[in-house]
C-alpha cells in the first residue's frame, strides 16, 4: 500500500489505515439515532462522462464496500457500462472516499453472505430464488422491483480525512 500524506505541509501526521478500516468494520451500517446516522454516497460515470452521485445503503464487509441496485436504475446502467466509481461515507470523526471498480456479484454463497449482513443491520434482504440477485419486502422506491443486483467495490485508492485531533488527510493506493 502506498501512503501519501496530503496534510504534511500543515504538519499533520498521516492517517492510520488500520484505524480507519477498524471504524469501517465496526460502524459501516447506519445507526438508528440521528446523532450517529450516516449516508453512503455512490458516484458513477454517466454515458456523457458527467458524474452521477446518489445515496446508497452500502455496507463495508471484508475490506470492501457492497451496494445493491436495480438493473434499470441510472447507477445500475452506469456501472454496467463503466464500472469506475467511488463511495463516500462519514464514519464518526472520519470521512472516507473509496475509489474502485464495481463488480457485479452473482456467486450464490457471496450473495447469501451479503444479504445476511444487510439483514443483520436491519434491512431484511435475502437471496432471490429466481437468479443472481437479492430481494426484500422493501427498498428505496427508485430501485424498481426485485431482484436487485449486488456490486462489490474493491478499493483501488482511498482518501481519508480525520476530523479530530491530531487531524489528518491521507491518500492510500492499494
Predicted regions, residues:
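Short histidine-centered beta-strand/loop micro-motifs
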Residues: 68-69, 77-80, 141-143, 162-163
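Short, intrinsically disordered, mixed-charge
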Residues: 80-85, 116, 120
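Short beta-strand segments
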Residues: 37-71, 77-79, 85-89, 96-101
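A generic structural signal for alpha-helix starts
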Residues: 73-74, 109
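An N-terminal domain-cap segment
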Residues: 11-56
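Charged, gly/pro-rich active-site loop segments
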Residues: 1-19, 94-174
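Short linear motifs in intrinsically disordered
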Residues: 27-34, 75-78, 141
Amino acid at each position: 500500500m502506498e501512503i501519501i500524506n496530503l496534510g504534511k505541509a500543515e504538519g499533520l501526521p498521516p492517517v492510520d489505515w488500520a484505524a480507519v478500516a477498524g471504524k469501517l468494520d465496526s460502524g459501516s451500517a447506519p445507526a438508528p439515532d440521528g446523532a450517529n446516522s450516516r449516508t453512503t454516497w455512490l458516484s458513477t460515470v454517466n454515458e456523457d462522462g458527467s458524474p452521477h452521485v446518489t445515496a446508497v445503503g452500502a455496507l463495508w464487509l471484508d475490506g470492501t464496500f457492497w451496494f445493491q441496485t436495480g438493473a434499470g436504475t441510472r447507477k445500475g446502467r452506469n456501472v454496467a457500462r463503466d464500472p469506475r466509481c467511488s463511495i463516500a461515507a462519514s464514519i464518526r470523526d472520519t470521512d472516507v472516499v473509496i475509489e474502485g471498480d464495481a463488480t457485479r456479484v452473482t456467486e450464490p454463497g457471496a450473495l447469501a453472505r451479503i444479504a445476511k449482513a444487510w439483514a443483520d443491520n436491519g434491512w431484511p434482504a435475502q437471496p432471490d430464488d429466481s437468479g443472481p440477485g437479492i430481494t426484500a419486502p422493501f427498498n428505496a422506491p427508485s430501485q424498481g422491483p426485485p431482484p436487485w443486483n449486488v456490486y462489490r467495490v474493491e478499493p483501488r485508492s482511498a482518501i481519508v480525512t480525520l476530523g479530530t485531533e491530531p487531524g489528518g488527510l491521507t491518500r492510500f493506493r492499494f
